[in-house]
Amino acid sequence: MPNRCDFCTSSSTKDKQQWTQCDGCDRWVHDVCVSITDPVSYAKYHCPTCTKTKGPSLYKRQSKRKKIDIDYAAMHSGNVDMSLRTRHVHSSRFTDVAASAQNKEPFKRVSGTELTLDWAQSSDGLNEPVIVPKEYKDTLGMYIPEDLTVRQVAEAVGMESPVEVINVVSQNGSPGWNMGKWTEYYEDIEGRDTILNVISLEISASALGKTIVRPTLVRELDLVDRVWPTNTDAARESKPRVSLYALMSVEDSFTDFHIDFAGSSVFYHVLKGRKSFMFIRPTARNLAAYSQWCLSADQNVVFLPDVLSPDSDIYTVHLSPGDTMYIPSGWIHAVHSPQDSLVVGGNFITPLNMKTQIDIAGIEVRTKVPMKFRYPLFAGVMWYYVLQLLANPERLNTMSTKERDGLNSVAEYLSGFIKTMSPTMKDVQYRRFVANFPMEIRPFPGKTLLDYCAMLDFYPKGVQETVDIDIRKKKGESKEKHKIESQLPEEKILQGSKLESKEEVQTENF
């Protein structure tokens, strides 16, 4: 969102509610400061500076770039009716870049029979998005009702069930919606006066969700299904629910660039309509640029590919009804809906992408992603993974190289996670924190972590400090110290660990 005009002449805030972007330098200006009375009359607008170097503004001619008139003051104040009069500011730019010859889809379109667990575990398996076209959908080991409708989704979860609806222009939530109201909006094509989107309706616990079978590869890779306990009602109830979503988008919906929470992988099956994706390869340089973009005050008006280096890899994928796509861990992407669409998909953490998943969880902390948009109980999944490996150490001898390469990252992550414990945490923060620790490792989870490190023969710097950390929150009491008989051999303390400070290892923004 623009926050500065280089030509300010008025001190009145009221006069500065309308902005226009210069086509010459891309700066945003207050209309009142540059005497713009009718911004939509320009085919190409030049600010006073650009007028001197690029010539005057042009009127009533076809511009190469469609002008977008967005009331940012209304968006900022939450006035939804005023802010939803146009497309998302990046929709046209997305279409232009997607049409560029160098951004054509490079990814494989294959039969589902090729996407085996052995393939995923290989060095070149599931490193890039991969598409299974409609003609091969029966090879995925998947069942989703192909005639599913938005109304049937609503009936399955309950018409009165609340649903998170996204205001496409602002990319913020629009409160007060339930599935009944959403269904009426979606079906009333002529009556729509806004562009709204539903992308976070989790349906695995619904009657509909219980009839759906995810692709075989997803079920084989899903770490939560592998490690989360199911022996008690409480354990089953607390299991993270991210495996099945119904995504319902109207024409011209747009989701800005993002990475799925905690770097989780995605499967995505289109039932109705078409979807267009723009992917950015998750290189270290691109992830750094993405992090800076997320923190920028101008994020809403800056198209991410425009701030990447010219040689960055950007790819476009178009999906039609019946197509299925896998999105690997960490890929940055934006999504546009050229038509009304209905999609069933889901997220899954894998044991093959631990370092990437943990790195993305760290980016979420640094970019201040709200807790509601992070992977639920991510650290808890890591602990149950550790417990399973400790119970079956022989797995180290048979696991794939990809999985083994991520084990040290888990140790580093959990060492840092324990150290975020503070007796001064607010109650809600503490409850969120402690919920990640299985009962069998409380109140001193560092002992379990040390056992895991011993199994790996890998000791992150400072891991010994975790052994004495009691995660019980005690007010007005001295903390009992927990001692262990054996201490870490000094030569095992890693001096080169990247985890040098509490700030760097913090994994939850409590």
Swiss-Prot record:
One of its GO terms (biological process) is chromatin remodeling. One of its GO terms (cellular component) is nucleus. InterPro entries: JHD, JHDM1_Histone_Demethylase, JmjC_dom, Znf_FYVE_PHD, Znf_PHD, Znf_PHD-finger. It holds the Pfam family JmjC. CDD domains: PHD_TCF19_like (cd15517). It catalyses: N(6),N(6)-dimethyl-L-lysyl(36)-[histone H3] + 2 2-oxoglutarate + 2 O2 = L-lysyl(36)-[histone H3] + 2 formaldehyde + 2 succinate + 2 CO2. Residues 216-365 form the JmjC domain. It is found in: Nucleus. The keyword Transcription regulation applies. GO terms for molecular function: histone demethylase activity; histone H3K36me/H3K36me2 demethylase activity; transcription coregulator activity; zinc ion binding. The gene is JHD1. Its EC number is 1.14.11.27. Residues 475-510 are annotated as: Disordered. This is JmjC domain-containing histone demethylation protein 1. Substrate binds at T255, K275. Binds 1 Fe(2+) ion per subunit. Residues 477-510 have a biased composition (Basic and acidic residues). Belongs to the JHDM1 histone demethylase family. A zinc finger (PHD-type) spans 2-53. It comes from Yarrowia lipolytica (strain CLIB 122 / E 150). The JmjC domain mediates the demethylation activity. Keywords: Chromatin regulator, Dioxygenase, Iron, Metal-binding, Nucleus, Oxidoreductase, Transcription, Transcription regulation, Zinc, Zinc-finger.
